Amino acid sequence: MYKFSYFTEEDKAKVIAFMQEYSFAVITGFGEQYPVATHIPLEIEIKENKIFLSGHIMKNTDHHKAFLKNENVLVIFNGPHCYVSASWYSGRGIASTWNYMTVHAKGKISFTQR
């Protein structure tokens, strides 16, 4: 993901609202040899000015085992996206692009015994 300052949302409330609206996210981690990922609906909660995500991951799967060994995760929330053709620009030498909205949240995963 390209991180240009003019595309970065600094308003924490807007970022949280985005995460809540597009809460079907991808949790990524690293297994024995390869990255692992799981798509999961998440609940977003704020406690003492910290963001907590909660959801359900089935036990004894490759991603559950990977997350037990390495608690560091990246959670990706994807929103609207669309192709932008170079022909839409008036200037020359402009390449086509893809506009999108996303949040990448880094943190640590923990499990309850429920």
Task: Describe each model-derived feature in a short phrase.
Residues 1-114:
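Binding-site signature for planar aromatic cofactors or substrates
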